[in-house]
C-alpha cells in the first residue's frame, strides 16, 4: 500500500494534479544515521536533544558550525532528535567539507558544485572555493540526475505556483531563487531551483536544492527571532550580482554541477512538506514556478 501511495503521489506531483505537498512518510529522528565522507575525520558522539537543549547549549560558541556539521537549521533542532556532537569543537571551526579547488571547472568564471554525498555546496571562482554551505537535496524518486546544468534565471522573492504553506493559502516561499534546470514533463514544464528553505538535516525536497534562509523562516513561521544563517542570500548575491533587481530575470549564470548520492536508505524519507521544496510545474520554459 505504501508503494502504491508513493507512486500515486509522485505521478500527481509531476503532472501538476495536486495542489498540496505529499506528507512525509518517515522523518529521520537521528542524524547520526546519515554518513558523510568527512565524518571520519572527526571524533563525535551521538547525542539526543532534550526539551531544554539549544544549539548553543550543545555546541557552545560554535553552534553555527555544529548545525552545519549536521546539515540542519535551528527550527529542526528539536527534542527527540539525535545529532552528531564533535568531541573537539575546535576541529570543525568554520566547518567546510568541500575541496578548496575544483580544477574541472575549465574556463568557467563561476561554478556551483553540489556534492550530494556530503550534502554540501561549494561556490568556485576560476576553480577556487569562495563560499560553501550545507544543503537539502531531493529524495531518491525526485532527485535530479548527476551532471552539468546552468543558472538561467534568478528571482529574489520567488514563490511556488504549485504549493501553499501548510495550513494556509499563502504560496510557499522560494526566496533567493536561482533556476538551473527546466524539463518537459507530460504537457507541462518542471523547473528546478536553488533557493532558501528549511534544512532538516537529511534529503527532503522534490528536486530543488535548499540553503539556509532564516529571514524567510521568521517571516513565514515566526522563528528564529534573530535571523543569522543566510546562505541563500549570500549565494544569490554572488551568482546574480549585487545590482540584481527583485523580479524574475533571465540570465546566463554560473554552471551548476551535481555529483554524488546521499548515504541514507532511500525508503527512510519522503519529501518534507514544511518547506519550499518542490520544483515548479509550468506550461513553458518561460513561465516561472
Question: PLM features: what roles do these ranges have?
Answer:
Residues 89, 95-140:
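A structural motif detector for short, solvent-exposed N-terminal "entry" segments of globular domains
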Residues 26, 162-289:
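Exported/periplasmic cell-wall-interacting domains
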Residues 29-62:
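Primarily a LysM-type cell-wall glycan-binding module
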Residues 50-77, 131-132, 222:
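LysM (lysin motif) carbohydrate-binding repeats in extracellular/periplasmic proteins that recognize
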Residues 81-83:
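Structural motif
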Residues 10-11, 21-23:
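Cleavable N-terminal signal peptides
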Residues 7-16:
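Bacterial N-terminal signal peptides
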Residues 1-6:
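Positively charged n-region of N-terminal signal peptides that target proteins for export
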